[in-house]
Amino acid sequence: MATCSICGKRAVTGNQVSHSNIKTKRTWAPNLQRVKLLVNGTPRRAYVCTRCLRSGKVQRAI
């Protein structure tokens, strides 16, 4: 299961409920992007959620 390397966000599980109220298990996955980051001055690839990218918690390598 993929996890955001910054905030630790991961997929959550719950029920998918049909119109006839039949419940089946399903997962909601975070929107993860594989980006190149600067970690201690060296570029590294990591999976980061889009919330961390938008909020500026990540310094991207170019």
From Swiss-Prot:
InterPro entries per the record?
A: Bacterial_rp_bL28, Ribosomal_bL28, Ribosomal_bL28/bL31-like_sf, Ribosomal_bL28_bact-type, Ribosomal_bL28_sf
Which ranges of the sequence are coiled-coil? none
Any single GO BP term: translation
Superkingdom of origin organism: Bacteria
- Keyword list, A-Z: Ribonucleoprotein, Ribosomal protein
List, in alphabetical order, the Gene Ontology terms for molecular function in this entry: structural constituent of ribosome
Family statement drawn from the similarity comment of this UniProt entry: Belongs to the bacterial ribosomal protein bL28 family.
Q: What is this protein called?
A: Large ribosomal subunit protein bL28
